[in-house]
Regions:
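Bacterial N-terminal signal peptides that target proteins for export
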Residues: 1-8
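Carbohydrate-interacting regions of secretory-pathway proteins
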Residues: 19-229
Length: 229
């Protein structure tokens, strides 16, 4: 192997090592998304959803029923940046690593979106509140704004690491490899029975989804961007 080839191999190795290190570090701020791709096309031609449920008007995506909308594309490592607005009592979420859209609840990771000001969610376990990894990891703080105000959320999924930032604050950091049980979280708290697959066993790729009008209250999304990493 000549010197030029050796230098090229070493250079590539250092570059890959640097990228790997950078991806393992939680983002410090919301990203600049100018060149990122849309999560969904304005005409929803790249989405999977029941007819008549989801509408995209004036840049705002919302649902009339409790039905999710999915990307047609399968993603593994990625960053999603979006804005969401709750109504009174909203309970929604961003769904990652979904390998079964018909039975997504035990076959995906849900990043919770909720109106934490509503009594039913304020009094629920922390793992049900906005910014949680639903049923598994409570956010370190509640950063969601009151209903009717827009929030910004950035979700980074890199292999088994998941980072959730809301309104400039990192609220959840998860290493899925630590969730080896389907019954209890690493801190000893109970996992809801319908979340029957240990996160350590979940594939780290799949469709991305948004939960619809769950629990009777609407949810609104806009400026939804994605970057593969």
């Amino acid at each position: 192997m000549n010197k030029a080839v050796v230098l090229a191999v070493v250079g590539c190795s250092l570059l890959l090592s640097s990228c790997s290190r950078n991806l393992s570090v939680p983002p410090k701020t919301h990203p600049k998304v100018g060149s990122w791709n849309d999560l969904f096309a304005p005409d929803l031609s790249d989405a999977i959803y029941p007819d008549g449920v989801w509408t995209f008007e004036d840049g705002v995506l919302t649902a009339s029923k409790d039905e999710a909308i999915w990307t047609k594309k399968d993603y593994d490592n990625f960053v999603i940046d979006l804005e969401f607005k709750t109504a009174e009592g909203t309970n929604s979420g961003v769904i990652a690593y979904c390998t079964d859209m018909q039975n997504w609840i035990p076959n995906s990771v849900e990043i919770q979106i909720a109106d934490d000001f509503a009594e039913q969610w304020a009094n629920s376990p922390g793992t049900w509140q906005c910014g949680a990894i639903f049923g598994h990891l409570a956010p370190t703080k509640s950063m969601v704004k009151k209903p009717g105000e827009w929030n910004r959320m950035t979700i980074t999924c890199h292999d088994q690491m998941i980072y959730v930032m809301i309104n400039g604050e990192m609220v959840s950091v998860m290493n899925m490899a630590l969730w080896t049980s389907a019954k209890t979280n690493p801190d000893g708290s109970e996992i809801p029975s319908w979340l029957s697959t240990p996160f350590a066993e979940l594939p780290t790729h799949g469709n991305i989804g948004l939960q619809g009008k769950h629990a009777g209250a609407p949810i609104y999304f806009r400026n939804m961007k994605i970057k593969e990493i």
